[in-house]
Amino acid sequence: MNAPLRGQVYRCDLGYGAKPWLIVSNNARNRHTADVVAVRLTTTRRTIPTWVAMGPSDPLTGYVNADNIETLGKDELGDYLGEVTPATMNKINTALATALGLPWP
């Protein structure tokens, strides 16, 4: 398996059913470690700054929950589901900064 890339979506089963997860860790880290950092995708809608709606060109319909951050072993990554658009990834970057209390321009 090639190293997963930031912005890619995989299905993972962490013991409560297979769910989609978006890789948010940087590509250099992804190449050199046995795990990745990811956030959950969900169909539940929340109108708070840490949730991002997927766009029409994204691989799934739903929302990214930037509050739900997990470290996933690469061996836990299941089916590849696609990659989010750069526009959606920019919104996710802002949501992650908000969730983690990081300064964002």
Swiss-Prot record:
<keyword id="KW-0378">Hydrolase</keyword>
<comment type="function">
    <text>Residues 29-56 inhibit ssDNA cleavage by DNA topoisomerase. This fragment does not have mRNA cleavage activity but it inhibits growth upon overexpression in M.smegmatis.</text>
</comment>
<keyword id="KW-1277">Toxin-antitoxin system</keyword>
<keyword id="KW-0540">Nuclease</keyword>
<comment type="subunit">
    <text>Forms a complex with cognate antitoxin MazE4. Interacts with DNA topoisomerase I.</text>
</comment>
<dbReference type="GO" id="GO:0004857">
    <property type="term" value="F:enzyme inhibitor activity"/>
</dbReference>
<protein>
    <recommendedName>
        <fullName>Endoribonuclease MazF4</fullName>
        <ecNumber>3.1.-.-</ecNumber>
    </recommendedName>
</protein>
<dbReference type="GO" id="GO:0016075">
    <property type="term" value="P:rRNA catabolic process"/>
</dbReference>
<dbReference type="GO" id="GO:0003677">
    <property type="term" value="F:DNA binding"/>
</dbReference>
<keyword id="KW-0255">Endonuclease</keyword>
<comment type="function">
    <text>Toxic component of a type II toxin-antitoxin (TA) system. Acts as an endoribonuclease (mRNA interferase) on single-strand mRNA, cleaving between the first and second bases in the sequence UCGCU. Overexpression in M.smegmatis but not E.coli inhibits growth, this effect is neutralized by coexpression with cognate toxin MazE4.</text>
</comment>
<dbReference type="InterPro" id="IPR011067">
    <property type="entry name" value="Plasmid_toxin/cell-grow_inhib"/>
</dbReference>
<comment type="similarity">
    <text>Belongs to the PemK/MazF family.</text>
</comment>
<dbReference type="InterPro" id="IPR003477">
    <property type="entry name" value="PemK-like"/>
</dbReference>
<dbReference type="Pfam" id="PF02452">
    <property type="entry name" value="PemK_toxin"/>
</dbReference>
<dbReference type="GO" id="GO:0004521">
    <property type="term" value="F:RNA endonuclease activity"/>
</dbReference>
<dbReference type="GO" id="GO:0006402">
    <property type="term" value="P:mRNA catabolic process"/>
</dbReference>
